[in-house]
Amino acid sequence: MSKKAKAIKKTNAMRLLDQVGANYTTHDYESTGAISGVEVAAALGQDPSMTFKTLVAEGAGRQSKGGGAERTKEHYVFVVPVAAELDLKKAAAAVGEKSIAMIRQKELLPLTGYEHGGCSPLGMKKQFRTIIDSSAADKETIMFSGGKIGLQIETAPAELAKALEFEYGEIV
């Protein structure tokens, strides 16, 4: 299944891909502390447009049938290119919310099981509705966090779909 140069301790994300027989490659890099996704892509010699970051947001209000907004507190996962910023209005529209807000960094680990800088869309404590930026749809492969700082997973979007239910959306 996976192709790797040296033995890497399996993360939940890797286990999920293995369970469904998805093909993927792992890439590891030396962690230098707080490192941006663009820096990770550069460290691995990858194009930043094929390298994606995982962001978690909370719904702040959904349109009710009567026209008002109701508070939802639903959590959503958005996967966007590392060189791009999530457009909160587009992201809210993609999930049917009036608005969304990014969760606080201190909420990430208890909510997802992943730390900041190592958050993967795969293998979270609970599966949240996931929207991947539509720019990923035409890529041969995409790369995203493998579930810990210093580890990236590269796979085809079709392979990712074997392990993760997601939708594409215009979110940047």
Predicted regions and their residues:
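Extended, low-hydrophobicity, polar/charged segments
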Residues: 1-172
